[in-house]
């Protein structure tokens, strides 16, 4: 059983809610690039490491858009971000049907599929990952925490 991570006690630094539609996915990508590259805690980080945060958020939102509301009206998704001096916490919340992440097999990396790599990437890019139903949110929460590495962020 996966550890359920706790949302930080303080209010999120960023809260964004939007319709879960493919139309918004490029905007989410641009938003991620802008917020991660400009945040004071991350301003000294290398581009390839910042890209991993962007990819994590993008893939989490993409999965919600493509899978959470299948056979339903378009739903919504929420993005919450917390910036700490030593980590970034990303939460993507949806109100569609949930799933069991352990039921999704890891892809064959020797013969990678064209699609279906999202959850694998999210887990690999996270230092701590969980997915759970939140009664408080009344929705599904993908929670990922990424430690800010000194080696990629030149000491801070």
What are the roles of these predicted feature ranges?
Residues 36-58, 111-112:
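Conserved short strand/loop->alpha-helix "switch" segment adjacent to the catalytic nucleotide/phosphoryl-transfer site
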């Amino acid at each position: 059983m996966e550890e359920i991570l706790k949302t930080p006690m303080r209010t999120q630094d960023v809260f964004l809610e939007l319709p879960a539609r493919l139309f918004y996915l490029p905007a989410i990508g641009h938003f991620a690039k802008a917020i991660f590259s400009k945040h004071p805690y991350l301003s000294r980080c290398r581009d390839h490491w910042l890209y991993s945060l962007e990819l994590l958020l993008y893939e989490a939102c993409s999965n919600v858009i493509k899978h959470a509301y299948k056979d339903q009206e378009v739903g919504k998704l929420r993005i919450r971000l917390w910036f700490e001096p030593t980590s970034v916490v990303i939460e993507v919340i949806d109100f569609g049907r949930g799933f069991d992440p352990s039921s999704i097999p890891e892809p064959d990396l020797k013969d990678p599929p064209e699609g279906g790599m999202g959850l694998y990437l999210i887990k690999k890019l996270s230092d701590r990952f969980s997915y759970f139903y939140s009664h408080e949110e009344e929705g599904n929460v993908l929670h990922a925490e990424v430690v800010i590495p000194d080696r990629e962020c030149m000491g801070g």
